[in-house]
């Protein structure tokens, strides 16, 4: 799910892709590891798109290239500094239809029977199909100069992020001759006891969210969990 963006790119560039556990170590589940077979050399590549700045030791030892979204320079282990590269933000996309989501998900589950979390494995394939949009939907359009749309998540441990997002919504609402639409996603109403956060009655489906975001005069981005580069930044770009 989190690495569908990279899988999409690989499937577009390489036609012969094989899913296998052979040649790989027991990595943290939040990664994408693959071996690129070139004419003169094989390259072992490990992609980390997690929120935090930490590193996976097994990934560092195994890989030739350790590509990471969220990096703090002073946390890079010196002995591996030459293989660590920043790759910027990413976001999940729909890469399989329902039929292929089921077929490929089950096929890869059978090939990887040592995995303990079968539900998470299957849900990753389902979620990219159910909740995300194909990359072709990410095309700019002419914005409406009288309209601002912004929808965001409330985070329990990121008060500054919530505060920044709330202030943007408040400022956008106060602008004359401009229509603001949006708010915080529902599901964490208990956080609103001491605040006045505008919480939506229902979530926007993803295609509608994209259309309204593209129509909006401006986009607003903040660091998210653990100060990470969130999906919104990648989508906005």
What are these regions (language model features)?
Residues 1-234:
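Nucleotide-sugar donor-binding catalytic core of glycosyltransferases
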Residues 237:
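A short, conserved alpha-helix in the catalytic core of glycosyltransferases
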